[in-house]
Amino acid sequence: MENKETFAFNADIQQLMSLIINTFYSNKEIFLRELISNASDALDKIRYEAITEPEKLKTKPELFIRLIPDKANNTLTIENSGIGMTKADLVNNLGTIARSGTKAFMEALQAGGDISMIGQFGVGFYSAYLVADSVTVVSKHNDDEQYVWESAAGGSFTVQKDDKYEPLGRGTRIILHLKEDQGEYLEERRLKDLVKKHSEFISFPIELAVEKTHEREVTESEDEEEKKADEKAEEKEGEEKKEGEEKKEGEEEKKEKTGKTKKVQEVTREWEQLNKQKPLWMRKPEEVTEEEYASFYKSLSNDWEEHLAVKHFSVEGQLEFKALLFVPKRAPFDLFETRKKRNNIKLYVRRVFIMDDCEDIIPEWLNFVKGVVDSEDLPLNISRESLQQNKILKVIRKNLVKKCLEMFAEIEEKKENYAKFYEQFSKNLKLGIHEDSANRAKIAELLRFHSSKSGEDMVSFKEYVDRMKEGQKDIYYITGESRQTVANSPFLEKLTKKGYEVLYMTDPIDEYAVQQLKEFDNHKLRCCTKEGLEIDESEEEKKKFEELKAEFEPLLKLIKEVLHDKVDKVVLSNRITDSPCVLVTTEFGWSANMERIMKAQALRDNSMTSYMVSKKTMEVNGHHSIMIEIKNKAAVDKSDKTVKDLIWLLYDTALLTSGFSLEEPTQFAARIHRMIKLGLSIDDDEEAKDDDLPPLEEVEGAADEASKMEEVD
């Protein structure tokens, strides 16, 4: 036996080990990820060498990683059949020569970095001391004999030729002598969970030694023989052969010879493969079945349903990576929960899990897409949890967005599937319109809306444009609280009578989306409730409109005088046919619906609200009997109290029908009551109560004051 040699750790390594041992880290579990990752690297190396020299695999043909928990001795063994280490490798790699990243890692650690970054500096092996008092490494390289490396991290380590442990053939066995309080890492469930969490997609089988209890029926004489055999381990194999021979003789014959039988339990150790989910993304898409995709998706997402769509692709060129993306059938209830840690895209480098919360890998509007991205050469810096070059990420991100849009277009081909998809994720698409300027036009093609002509179906912008009226330039839409509300809106009266189709946008996020989406296929999007609406009219219609405008000019001036600064201007309308009047907003200000949405924001910016709330324009229908009668009354006496009351009443009703909220509901009710009394010819005794109402001028002043108060609120 070769003498044991003692070596001193390099100063930096000694300092690093001291830091690991004497500092408390909550996530000690990362040691297993690091050791499995190192084992995978060792297996990659021998597999690579065997491409040109196949005989190198003969010393141990199987490629595997094995975990062996031993509760009796309080040890956890991580074994692999990789390339192994020579004596020189053990001395140099595990102690005397510090890697370039050792110092940098300690600096990062002392600056508040995470212990889980250790593997990025090439010193992941030392994470073993997070859970172990001492570590034994047994290794066999094809070019050397089997050696043992041992250290209790006391500043030195020993190396000697091995004559104690079972021959490996080739590979490395790391034996962790666990600290007293780290027994959890001997539990079968804990080890399985850790492998599933961090190392499920390592491309080599990870096997766990598990104890299985089997019950079998034996004769009493057999039982006695087996008890004797248990005392001599080397005779066990012979006993099993004997048992096999006896089974062949038949149960009946055994019963005759030996009499009674009884059931006994025996415990055997078996290898259970933990990473059964093979990396599907490494295979060609045409080789993977739908069942495999479904199984993989469920394993990845913990979803109880199968996926709705899948995209399996690889990118080569500036950056090489493979990816597998899934669209779920339903959105999670907390899809837009801002505090939730995102973990939908898992990032791997050469099948080693790096992170699942990389915010830069996919935009927020695609946060429902689940999947895996695996790069062969993605550069990393301090940790597996932080990436070094944003340029690389931008390439990955750009490709993922492109492929997601392709996947959505594929879903679109099946109307029933797309209806399910759109019901669940339409808000995400609209958020994409708002946030993703580069892909806005493509996302717009995916949007669907109900319309004045679509009935229960939904229509796309493309379908709308294809069936536009001859000569129609703009795409008309209306925003509102519900389909029923917008369908009955006075703003649609003229458009629908002339046969124009109007899109109904009733989702609050539609307001934000159309602010960014100005046009589709060179057709401007035009809101029916705002100024600037152009409806094609004949020359005769235009002439009649101008004549009517001149006729109503005195009334329009009177309405502006009465309403004062409640409206910016009063004009004759060419957009309504059945309603007496409506209130429209400026083209670039908030619509009535947007105003309603913003007022509901608990944390709204009131200064912004007062700035964006548009000055309203009152549009009067010159063909409506009410407006004609008021015009006639005003021509007789423009200071008539009833005329002024009616103007205020029309303003309040226009607020409601145009989608605004009432500014003074009490005063509105008072005016209604006054009109009711007038209609019922209430006598003078009741009229006294009317005197309690403030005069119109005061009502107007109170409204102004309330408006100011709302701005301050």
Curated annotation (Swiss-Prot):
PROSITE patterns: HSP90. Residues 226-264 have a biased composition (Basic and acidic residues). It is found in: Cytoplasm. Residues 212-264, 685-713 are annotated as: Disordered. The keyword Chaperone applies. The keyword Ligase does not apply. Gene3D superfamilies: 3.30.230.80, 3.40.50.11260, Heat shock protein 90, C-terminal domain, Histidine kinase-like ATPase, C-terminal domain. One of its GO terms (cellular component) is cytoplasm. Residues 685-703 have a biased composition (Acidic residues). A motif (TPR repeat-binding) lies at residues 709-713. ATP binds at residues 38, 125, 384. GO terms for molecular function: ATP binding; ATP hydrolysis activity; ATP-dependent protein folding chaperone; unfolded protein binding. Keywords: ATP-binding, Chaperone, Cytoplasm, Nucleotide-binding, Stress response. The TPR repeat-binding motif mediates interaction with TPR repeat-containing proteins. Homodimer. Belongs to the heat shock protein 90 family. Molecular chaperone that promotes the maturation, structural maintenance and proper regulation of specific target proteins involved for instance in cell cycle control and signal transduction. Undergoes a functional cycle that is linked to its ATPase activity. This cycle probably induces conformational changes in the client proteins, thereby causing their activation. Interacts dynamically with various co-chaperones that modulate its substrate recognition, ATPase cycle and chaperone function. This is Heat shock protein 90. The gene is HSP90.
